[in-house]
């Protein structure tokens, strides 16, 4: 009996030993970035290595010429290791990294170092000469149906009848309509995020919008592949179109591997409530309680504490550390390893895909100082590149506080640090962010459309007053203006007022701003968010198989759609290369008699935007505008081709807009 007992114990010990060895077997399943580029101004490269037991390797070595292992960082999770390399003297090629455990065989990983396509200074971003066209890939056009259902992804379905589920648009659908953008006259395309969002549908909602990233180095396969994305950008460039990539540093998606296996305890903000013992938590929409009793921390969505010089700690914490929604964990940019990962990711997409700009989502929700470091590094590497930050507060003073105009001659260094001496609760110093979004313009214009322009504050007076604060901006010409986007009601709401829409667009495209359009405005798409955001993100007519209505072609548009398309297209093509708009001075006149006038001037050439801000006929009394008209007798309305005699008063129909072009005669 003792003999059998001994054998049984021996077998059990052997099984236990083998199981332990199996559990600790070293493996490398992923390295981020997937590859890298030599010749960067910053020679440091962070590799995030993921694999079973990888944290506890004894050494990481390489014999690749010009590469040095500077340090390795062991995180809380046994499945992550950060390797910091110096590539200062490296050349393109395949580098082999060896990960040696304390016991057992080392694991070797081949890693590609690539040649850059061009120097960073050769990459030119968007600016005031451009018109950005914002679209949602899932809602614009479908060029393939074989990517509608991807095996292995979390449960989802395509259903075009449901405004908050996926509809099946993709990169190929956009690529097939590149000529449409040229016909319209826009010069840059901004797609809402295209990276993988592997979140399950829940409660009739999905992450079709792209703002819950689960893989920072992979295009969502329902949109296409990385190769298809790069092809789309190359073909856009061949047609003179720039491409702006939407990024999110503030948060990731709940299904990102960082959530289930957090690299370190401080990788996320307010992670305490996440635990296996949490009960009753819906990963998409629910709340929960951690095993320690900690509660889910929700952001307040109030951005003012970030600039408030009197901000309380609790308010600032809720803004910057609270989660946007339960399905979007808040990233901790104060952790330098998190920020290095994100910075490198933005650089990787610039180098790999050749994007021409970045739109950074929820910019003030992230910690200001790490974000400023990102912008400083990006501006140094790409001095002519541009990034726009979403800064959603409708007061110009708030928006202007985020803009810092860097001096390219100083390698991206800020030349006006005194403009940001304190920056409220978030600390001081420049942001290095070149472009901000003009939510004041959006807000005031959408109020004015419902009002009569009186002698004081109503109607277009709101726009006039908003522009008065341009002195707060370091560079007003690098502020992005819009009348609607994917997060707002459509400008038309549930209506079809073409005259009002033309007035808004005439203003948008002639003031001292970078203008941004939203897909479908050119064919008068409307809708409100009253029920769901999906109702302002409807499918573009003709973009999907089986559509009976095709707004991509003149023949397929209704008469009203064609009239708006033709009017806007004419204005957009006129704006291209028009230096009066891109370089000229701007002068505005207080609305008088319900009429608002803005003049753009350059070397005698003048563009006069004239808006009747009332629902009744009005008169532009030319004598009031003598300083910008002079003795000019003849002006051309560029949208209609009609000529106006500026020696006489101009009669305007209700809500009429004119864009008059002339050479000023003294």
Write out the residue ranges for each language-model feature:
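Immunoglobulin-like IPT/TIG beta-sandwich domains and homologous Ig-like subdomains
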Residues: 40-103
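Beta-strand/beta-sandwich contexts
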Residues: 21-55, 113-116
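Hydrophobic faces of well-ordered beta-strands that scaffold small-molecule active sites
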Residues: 133, 189-191, 243-245, 358, ...
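Substrate-binding/active-site clefts of carbohydrate-active enzymes
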Residues: 140-347, 352, 371-381, 391, ...
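Active-site clefts of carbohydrate-active enzymes
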Residues: 476-496
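Carbohydrate-interacting/catalytic domains
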Residues: 19-22, 100-131, 182, 523-666
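Active-site-proximal helices and loops of the catalytic beta/alpha 8
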Residues: 251, 345-347, 351-474, 496-498, ...
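Bacterial Sec-dependent N-terminal signal peptides
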Residues: 1-28
